[in-house]
Curated annotation (Swiss-Prot):
It comes from the Eukaryota. Residues 256-285 are annotated as: Disordered. GO terms for biological process: chromosome organization; maturation of 5.8S rRNA from tricistronic rRNA transcript (SSU-rRNA, 5.8S rRNA, LSU-rRNA); maturation of LSU-rRNA from tricistronic rRNA transcript (SSU-rRNA, 5.8S rRNA, LSU-rRNA); protein-RNA complex remodeling. HAMAP family: WDR12. Its main location: nucleus. Component of the NOP7 complex, which is required for maturation of the 25S and 5.8S ribosomal RNAs and formation of the 60S ribosome. This is Ribosome biogenesis protein ytm1. SMART domains: WD40. GO terms for cellular component: nucleoplasm; PeBoW complex; preribosome, large subunit precursor. InterPro entries: G-protein_beta_WD-40_rep (IPR020472), NLE (IPR012972), WD40/YVTN_repeat-like_dom_sf (IPR015943), WD40_repeat_CS (IPR019775), WD40_repeat_dom_sf (IPR036322), WD40_rpt (IPR001680), WDR12/Ytm1 (IPR028599). Keywords: Nucleus, Repeat, Ribosome biogenesis, rRNA processing, WD repeat.
Length: 488
């Protein structure tokens, strides 16, 4: 069905076609029908498009709004009749159907070119955690993008794709190897980590006009014995979590005065530096500290560590050893272990749903309930990627939304209410797939890349103001945002 005419025609015909009484509701006040709008009789042949036309007619919208429809918390992907049959529901029942705005297609906004692979990205905006924690005001148009690269440098970009600031080289207090993770802690502080085994804190400052700035070394944190794969920050408690290939989770303070001394055996040895390096470093003195704790329980590299969104004294970690572990950060003790069937490569918390999303080496995302009362390990599986899922971020607009970045060269948007049932149980399907703009520009958008060769996505961030920001092997930051369909 491709328009609403079927509804009109059928509604006026004799009762030759099955009908069902539906109650249309919405939790979004600006699109809700009046409270006194009772159930209406509609043909069971209606699908999403015709239902959307019906709701727009009932609302009296001059400009139609695309809607999605949910029955019992699941998106309607068939006709009403097929849904009733599949779920054993009588057409005599009054069916409650919730409608929501359809997701806006994420269009390409901009790409920022780098000299090397881009491993990590973060956003500073009025709605980003760093600004929210600090109660800072970021004016529209003054948002910043942070990137961490395999060339060992941090860069801060403005929305006009100009570099505002670059971190110093290794000789001047910068990273001595590739950066794997970078986050804004506050609007004036950045945390980064990478293959040089250090977590580093930086003071970020801008000129008054905002077109230039500096990233100055502030604190070096030593404790890991192998590369660091990811970071999580929590500015209100001045805490950082790091995930390392040495099988441990690092727990750190962002404040020099709170942190213990750095382990002597892990500090850069003066003997290992060339005379030229010593000379260059002589003007750069950066305080060095150690971890508050190293959480050791995993038996393989730790890929991700995050804070519980509702309780920063709780941490979660995911590892190549197939396990998800829950930590009490006050006592530095292991609380719970959930073992899955595959290596876990990324992690995100969906707090309102009491779920953790974990990206796997087996190309899917598993949703895990970490609560002790949970009877099953995996609550749902999200399938669609064709290579490892290495980055995850929540949808800032929706409790049910998630985005994933994969080595297959795509980012996929998920709404966990968009499901189907197959031999593996309830399986989620992606709502949109975002490809790399670099392929399109090369005229190779239809070219099948084995495993995402050349365009692997390494990091994705979803900001309410800026949009979806992803980074990857194509040496680019890419920004996509839902524009051009709805103004609201």
């Amino acid at each position: 069905m491709n328009d609403g005419s079927d509804f009109d025609a059928t509604a006026t015909s004799s009762a030759a076609q099955r009908q069902v009484r539906v109650q249309l509701t919405s939790k979004q006040e600006d699109i809700a029908l009046p409270d006194n709008a009772g159930p209406i009789l509609v043909p069971t042949s209606l699908r999403r498009y015709a239902l959307s036309t019906l709701v727009n007619n009932l609302l009296g919208n001059d400009k139609p709004i695309p809607f999605e429809f949910l029955i019992n918390g699941t998106f309607l992907r068939t006709s009403i009749d097929e849904y009733l049959t599949a779920n054993g529901i009588s057409a005599e029942t009054t069916l409650e159907i919730e409608y929501v705005r359809a997701l806006i297609p994420p269009l390409h906004i901009a790409s920022f070119q780098h000299d090397d692979w881009v491993s990590s990205t973060d956003v500073l905006s009025a709605t980003s955690p760093a600004a929210t924690w600090a109660s800072a005001t970021i004016s529209q148009g003054q948002e910043k993008i942070l990137s961490g690269s395999y060339d060992g440098l941090l860069r801060v970009w403005n929305m006009s794709s100009q570099i505002v600031a670059t971190s110093p080289a290794a000789a001047d207090g910068g990273h001595t190897a590739s950066i794997k993770a970078a986050k804004f802690v506050t609007p004036n502080q950045i945390a980064s980590a990478g293959l040089d085994r250090t977590v580093r804190l930086w003071k970020y400052s801008e000129s008054d006009e905002g077109f230039s700035g500096t990233i100055a070394p502030q604190l070096e944190l030593y404790g890991h014995k192998s590369g660091i794969n990811s970071l999580a920050v929590h500015a209100p408690s001045n805490r950082i979590l790091s995930a390392s290939s040495d099988n441990s989770v690092g727990f750190w303070s962002t404040k020099k005065s709170d942190a213990p001394a750095a382990p002597e055996d892990l500090l850069p040895s003066a003997a290992s530096r060339s005379s030229k390096r010593r000379k260059l470093n002589s003007s750069v003195t950066v305080p060095q500290r150690g971890p508050l704790a190293l959480l050791s329980s995993h038996t393989a590299p730790v890929s991700a560590a995050i804070f519980d969104e509702k309780d920063s004294t709780v941490g979660y970690s995911a590892s190549w050893d197939h396990s998800l572990r829950t930590w009490d950060l006050v006592t530095s003790t292991l609380v719970d272990t959930r073992t899955t069937s595959h290596s876990l490569l990324s992690l995100e918390h969906l707090p309102e749903l009491s779920l953790l999303a974990a990206g796997t080496s087996a190309r899917h995302i598993t949703l895990i309930d970490p609560r002790a009362s949970a009877t099953t390990i995996s609550a749902m599986t999200l399938r669609g990627h064709t290579n490892a899922v290495v980055s995850l971020a929540r949808d800032p607009h929706s409790t049910y939304g998630l985005i994933s970045g994969s080595h297959d060269g795509t980012c996929r948007i998920w709404d966990i209410r968009a499901t189907k049932t197959d031999k593996d149980g309830v399986v989620g399907e992606s709502v949109y797939s975002i490809s790399r703009k670099s392929l399109e520009e090369q005229g190779k958008s239809d070219t099948k890349r084995v495993g995402g060769e050349g365009v692997k996505v390494f990091s994705v961030c979803w900001d309410k103001t800026v949009g979806i920001v992803s980074a990857g092997e194509d040496k680019r930051i890419q920004i996509n945002r839902g524009e051009g369909v709805l103004s609201a």
